[in-house]
C-alpha cells in the first residue's frame, strides 16, 4: 500500500490500498501527476501502471505493460514514459525482452512500444528540464527526442567498462549526471557531462551511488 503523508507535520494521514499486491509480490515505485490523478508504476513481479484519484485516494484504473516497469516520467506533451526490465531468466513471474512505453495520460493507453533485445536491462528513465528529451541507461547512456519514431542507433555516451547505476539531468542547464558504482565495494563516482556529451567534471561520493534529487 501507499502511505499518504502531511509534509508540514511529518505525519501519516492515511494510505491507499493497491489491489492484487502483497509485500512478496510487488512494489510501487515512482509517481507522476496529470490533473487530479496520480500514476505509479508497480515493479517487482508486477506489470502495471496504476491510476489514483487524489480526491478519493483510491486506485481507479490500471494499465498493463511489460514485466517489471522500473521508471515513470511525464514529458512536455503529457505523455508518460516507462521502461520495463523484462524480469530475469528463471523468474517465476516470467522473462521477456524489455520495452520502452509511451503512454497518453489523457486516455491512459499505450501509444508506442519500443522493444529491446532479450537480455538487455534498461533502467533510470529521465527527462531534461524542457521535458522534450528522454534519457536512460542500457549498458550505454541513451538519449532520444520524445517525438522520435524509433530508438537511436548510437548512444549518447558509450559504455566504458564500468557500472552505470544512476542517472539524472540538471533541469536548469541540461547537464547530465551519471552515477558509477564501479564494483559495488569502493567509493562510487559521479560524472558530469554537457548536453552535447562532453565530460565536464568527475568526483567521488559514497559506496553505490544510485539516485539523485534536485532542490
Region roles according to the model:
Residues 1-34:
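Asp-box/WD-like beta-propeller blade repeats and closely related beta-sheet repeat scaffolds
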Residues 6-10, 52-58, 104-108, 145-150, ...:
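Short loop/turn segments that connect beta-strands within beta-propeller blades
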Residues 11-22, 58-64, 109-117, 150-159, ...:
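A short beta-strand motif characteristic of beta-propeller blades
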Residues 23-32, 67-75, 119-129, 161-169, ...:
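Repeated scaffold domains used in trafficking and secretory/extracellular systems
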Residues 34-85:
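Loop-centered beta-sheet repeat module
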Residues 39-45, 80-95, 127-129, 133-140, ...:
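Conserved beta-strand positions in repeat-built beta-propeller and related beta-rich domains
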Residues 150-181:
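C-terminal hydrophobic structural anchor segments
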Amino acid at each position: 500500500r501507499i502511505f499518504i503523508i502531511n509534509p508540514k507535520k511529518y505525519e501519516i494521514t492515511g494510505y491507499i490500498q493497491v489491489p492484487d499486491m502483497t509485500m512478496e509480490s510487488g512494489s510501487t515505485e515512482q509517481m507522476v501527476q496529470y490533473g487530479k490523478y496520480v500514476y505509479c508504476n508497480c515493479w517487482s513481479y508486477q506489470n502495471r501502471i496504476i491510476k489514483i484519484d487524489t480526491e478519493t485516494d483510491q486506485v481507479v484504473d490500471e494499465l498493463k505493460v511489460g514485466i517489471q516497469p522500473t521508471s515513470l516520467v511525464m514529458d512536455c506533451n503529457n505523455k508518460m514514459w516507462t521502461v520495463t526490465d523484462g524480469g530475469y531468466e528463471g523468474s517465476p513471474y516470467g522473462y521477456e525482452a524489455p520495452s520502452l512505453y509511451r503512454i497518453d495520460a489523457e486516455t491512459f493507453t499505450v501509444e508506442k512500444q519500443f522493444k529491446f533485445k532479450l537480455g538487455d536491462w534498461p533502467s533510470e528513465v529521465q527527462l531534461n528540464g524542457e521535458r522534450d528529451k528522454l534519457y536512460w541507461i542500457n549498458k550505454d547512456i541513451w538519449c532520444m527526442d520524445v517525438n522520435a519514431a524509433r530508438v537511436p542507433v548510437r548512444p549518447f555516451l558509450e559504455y566504458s567498462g564500468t557500472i552505470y547505476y544512476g542517472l539524472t539531468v540538471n533541469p536548469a542547464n541540461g547537464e547530465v549526471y551519471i552515477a558509477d558504482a564501479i564494483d559495488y565495494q569502493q567509493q562510487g563516482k559521479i560524472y558530469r557531462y554537457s548536453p552535447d556529451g562532453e565530460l565536464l567534471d568527475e568526483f567521488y561520493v559514497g559506496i553505490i551511488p544510485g539516485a539523485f534529487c534536485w532542490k
